[in-house]
A protein has these predicted regions:
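Short, solvent-exposed loop/turn elements at domain surfaces
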Residues: 44-48, 71-74
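Bacterial N-terminal signal peptides
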Residues: 10-18
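Bacterial N-terminal signal peptides that target proteins for export
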Residues: 2-9
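Surface-exposed loop/edge segments in extracytoplasmic proteins
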Residues: 73, 81-88
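Sec/Tat signal peptide C-region and signal peptidase I cleavage site
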Residues: 21-25
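Extracellular/periplasmic metallocenter environments
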Residues: 26-47, 90-125
Length: 125
């Protein structure tokens, strides 16, 4: 085979693999003025399907799913004033929704039962 052709094929394969392994967070969807954020809670940490960058003040619906085999919880506060916005327990595999008003102060959330660090989101516009 032609060495140039082999090199081009190898580069094409590497480029294709690099595209297929990149993952992009979804943008938060807004319906009827409410922005939805999905949070999956695992043992000691949260994962989100949507990016938390560039959020705007407004009404948010957090859909939290307990992905562990034990009782956990969800707590959300105003990031500046530490005002409690919502707090509740989640049984294993349970999903609950928290609808809150987020201001330009930002917000922070954590599990108050299974110690996790505060996830502080202060870039809300």
């Amino acid at each position: 085979m032609n060495p140039l052709k082999n090199t081009l094929m190898a580069l094409l394969v590497l480029f294709t693999l690099s595209l297929s392994t990149q993952s992009y967070a979804e943008l938060a969807q807004q319906v009827d003025g409410v922005t939805t954020i999905h949070l999956d809670q695992y043992g000691g940490y949260f994962e989100t399907k949507e990016t938390l960058a560039g959020l705007k003040a407004g009404t948010y619906e957090f859909i939290i799913t307990n992905k562990t085999n034990k009782l956990v919880g969800f707590q959300i506060q105003n990031n500046k004033t530490k005002e409690q916005l919502d707090k509740f327990p989640l049984e294993p595999n349970q999903t609950r929704t928290s609808k809150v008003e987020i201001t330009a102060d930002g917000f922070r959330f954590r599990c108050p039962i299974n110690p996790t660090p505060w996830y502080e989101i202060d870039g809300v516009k």
